[in-house]
Amino acid sequence: MLILISPAKTLDYQSPLATTRYTQPELLEYSQQLIGIARKLSAPQIGKLMSISDKLADLNATRFHDWHPDFTPQNARQAILAFKGDVYTGLQAETLTEDDFDFAQQHLRMLSGLYGVLRPLDLMQPYRLEMGIRLENPRGKDLYQFWGDTITEKLNQALRDQGDDIVINLASDEYFKSVKTPKLQGQLIKPVFLDEKNGKFKVISFYAKKARGLMSRYIIENRLTQPEQLKAFNSEGYFFDADASEKGELVFKRHEQ
């Protein structure tokens, strides 16, 4: 079972580390190409491209300039501990055990605009480069064209290494679009999280993102290997709704809090 999640814009390079173990990202030669392109952009150009404030544009121009491919624990941090968005609030990686990290390293992958595919313990230097950004490059007009089949090939390798063909898609549409599904050698399962509001169940972005992290943690902590086992997920009040689910899509609902 291979879990896919999105990265986060919010980063944490200060908190105590839950593990000192680390690995190196496997697609750094691609990252270097993107950094080379990004370094040619001025801060105002970065601001316009990413629709961010002047302050954030300056920060990310500095990050691109400071980035270099010699990753050490002194200048980088394990990806699963560096990302700090809603998904990672649900995942709570800072409380995982060493055995949990072992399982996650084999069964969890983070999709990334700059790094392509990250394993949990892969070191990464801080960046902001969302997958949906239209950054022109030698392979095309955006990052989807830049990455081409590379991300899919890396995921196929991970599927072979971990021994089955089940892919749990907990990534956002923006990031999952970087995966060429016809070429993915796996059976796709997409959990969907619906929260009740005014008597109706619907996707509420903040809750859905956190739930993706909760589900990731549930799989890791319980060492799940079969899709059927996902149906028992009940963190923070969610329950499986068989009637609303269909092939390839598992629907979980939660009553109004």
From Swiss-Prot:
One of its GO terms (cellular component) is cytosol. Keywords: Cytoplasm, DNA-binding, Virulence. One of its GO terms (molecular function) is DNA binding. The keyword Heme does not apply. A motif (Helix-hairpin-helix) lies at residues 35-66. It is found in: Cytoplasm. It comes from the Bacteria. HAMAP family: UPF0246. Belongs to the UPF0246 family. This is DNA-binding and peroxide stress resistance protein YaaA. It comes from Klebsiella pneumoniae subsp. pneumoniae (strain HS11286). The gene is yaaA.
